[in-house]
Amino acid sequence: HWGGGLWISSLDHARVGQLMLNKGWWNGREIIPEKWVDECLTPCPLSPIYGYLWWLNDAKNGMFPGAPSSAFYAMGVGTQIIYIDPENELVIVARWIEKDKMPDFVNMVLASIEN
């Protein structure tokens, strides 16, 4: 069992990430209410690093210590990740990458855009 079975391409993963980065807006149309996106990114009562199906990059407990605390991500089976970084206006899609390698990968991308 793979948790529900959302099977989409990397391009569609990126579109989901861009939609979240844009707070629900796509090409001038509100697809998802901005309030819902804000709720998705609000920590739940059980964990300060989890919202509605989105992981939050809390400075102390987040997966990406070198990334802004405003970053958030979705992670699925096989460490398929949609990483969204509002501070840098960045969406990263990575698929079938070792989970422990992902923080270094994100840090390399962030370093490349800082220079």
Residue ranges and their predicted role:
Residues 74-115:
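Structured C-terminal helix/loop/strand segments within mature extracytoplasmic catalytic/sensor domains
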Residues 1-5, 69-70:
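Active-site rim elements
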Residues 4-25, 80-96:
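Active-site-proximal alpha-helical segments within enzyme catalytic domains
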Residues 24-32, 100:
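Structural helix-adjacent loops and short alpha-helical linkers that scaffold large soluble proteins
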Residues 38-91:
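Active-site Gly/Thr loop motif
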Residues 14-21, 37-41, 55, 70, ...:
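Non-transmembrane alpha-helical segments in soluble domains
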Residues 2, 17-20, 30, 34-47:
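Catalytic pocket-lining loop regions of alpha/beta-barrel enzymes
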